[in-house]
């Protein structure tokens, strides 16, 4: 069946030296299958899969995607002993107040269109495919995150877009050590994922941060205007036709 084919493909990659990770989106309909899922992953891949934390994007605070209380949700899914799950719950609905370097140290690019933005949760501010001769805009989020919390912090925060925060490494989030000692990440990938972005990028001093903060209202206005035009051209104009 499809599940057998899935695990067969993952193991083929592993046998050829590729790094991999297997991740599950936990939802209430899977609760009765938890033991079976864990045992299947251990049998096929030597360890239980990592699990994320589901969110309800239809709610203002992006609440947990579950009918259970947070305490019940945590108790049920802790069985996977997942570093990803633990960290995502730890940062759940906690607003980031420190200066965030997403946008200057990171860039989210839609490979289908070229639309780009600092991270998943911010406004689009450019298209790097339409005008490849133009310099890429690298503007940090700073202290102006639009989201109630960093819902994909398992990637951005662990890589260090907010250097002041103590977090696991991205390798901790993605790797698993099997019962026989093998690991899902190769040494090279594990070493790369264990770094922090501050190791190889400029950390701004307070003077540079303050200068950026003074310019931010103008940057935001320009970004909002660009993002609105993108939405108009893609959605509203298309509907009118």
Could you tell me what each predicted segment is?
Residues 1-117, 121, 126-130, 165-173:
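Radical SAM enzyme [4Fe-4S]-AdoMet core and its adjacent flexible, acidic
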Residues 115-241:
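Flexible mid-to-C-terminal extensions adjoining Fe-S/redox cofactors in radical SAM and related proteins
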């Amino acid at each position: 069946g499809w599940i057998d084919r899935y695990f067969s493909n993952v193991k083929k990659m592993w046998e050829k030296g590729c790094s991999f990770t297997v991740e599950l989106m936990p939802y209430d309909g899977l609760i009765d299958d938890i033991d079976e899922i864990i045992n299947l992953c251990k049998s096929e891949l030597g360890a239980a899969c990592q699990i994320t934390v589901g969110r309800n994007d239809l709610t203002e605070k992006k609440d947990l995607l579950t009918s259970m209380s947070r305490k019940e949700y945590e108790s049920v899914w802790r069985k996977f002993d997942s570093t990803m799950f633990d960290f995502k719950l730890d940062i759940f609905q906690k607003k980031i107040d420190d200066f965030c370097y997403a946008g200057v140290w990171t860039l989210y690019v839609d490979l289908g269109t070229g639309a780009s933005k600092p991270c998943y949760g911010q406004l689009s501010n450019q298209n790097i495919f339409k005008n490849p001769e133009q310099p890429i805009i690298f503007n940090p989020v700073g202290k102006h995150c639009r989201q109630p919390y960093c819902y994909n912090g398992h990637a951005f925060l662990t890589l260090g877009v907010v250097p002041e925060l103590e977090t696991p490494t991205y390798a901790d989030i993605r790797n698993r050590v099997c019962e026989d000692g093998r690991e899902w990440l190769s040494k090279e990938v594990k070493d790369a994922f264990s770094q922090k972005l501050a190791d190889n990028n400029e950390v701004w001093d307070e003077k540079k941060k303050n200068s950026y903060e003074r310019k931010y209202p103008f940057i935001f206005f320009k970004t909002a205007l660009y993002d609105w035009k993108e939405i108009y051209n893609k959605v509203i104009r298309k509907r009118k036709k």
